[in-house]
A protein has these predicted regions:
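Charged, terminal alpha-helix-loop-beta segments
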Residues: 1-194
Length: 194
């Protein structure tokens, strides 16, 4: 639904991805990989066998001479709908923070073996899409997450990792996507679904 599994932005046409459902800014990126080991990413070398559901490297928005470092990095982790149990190894917050730590370690190289400057100043964004179960609530509380005003998710900023993280329920994901589209449909005077 969002992006094909075990694919990259190099081999998936724009019309076969629905990244806008999570955040419309994700449609504009430099490189995206889905369910591919960090060590196997094309043009980038990160010594790790971890496989984020989605890892997205964004273009810088400022114009610079030569090849620019990444403006931001986005990690998306999906958990199966209606999943009940999680043990500590399956804690999605630990998972995304682990991916981010590996990327920030400074061992990331381009396809020619040159180090890619991923400084501590580059912002990271993490989206965890899952049902909000009692265990997810426990993980969120432990990490100091704040409940969203609609009670359908959590958010947090981790200063040590320079990472903004959202835990989004599947219901909230669908609800927010509908709301974003309804505004456009209303402006175009098209039928609106509620």
């Amino acid at each position: 639904l969002i992006f094909p599994i075990k694919a990259t932005s190099d081999n998936v046409d724009f019309d076969r991805q629905n990244l806008w459902i999570i955040d419309e800014k994700l449609a504009y990126h430099k490189y995206l990989a889905s369910e591919i080991k960090l060590s196997n990413l094309e043009g980038i070398s990160i010594p790790s066998n971890d496989r984020p559901d989605l890892v997205i490297f964004n273009h810088p928005f400022a114009f610079v001479e030569g090849e620019a470092p990444y403006a931001s990095v986005v990690i998306v982790e999906f958990k199966r709908p209606m999943r009940k149990g999680y043990n500590e190894d399956e804690n999605p917050i630990n998972q995304v923070f682990g991916y981010i730590s590996k990327i920030q370690e400074g061992n990331t190289t381009d396809k020619d073996g040159r180090l890619i400057p991923i400084s501590k100043n580059i912002p990271f964004y993490a989206y965890i899409v899952c049902d909000i179960t009692p265990k997810i609530k426990e993980f969120a509380k432990f990490y100091g997450f704040t409940v969203t005003p609609d009670q359908m998710g959590y958010f947090n900023f981790n200063t040590n990792l320079n990472t903004y993280t959202e835990i989004i329920s599947f219901d909230k994901l669908v609800s927010d996507a509908k709301k974003r589209n309804n505004v456009l449909f209303e402006k175009l005077h098209l039928p609106v679904t509620r």
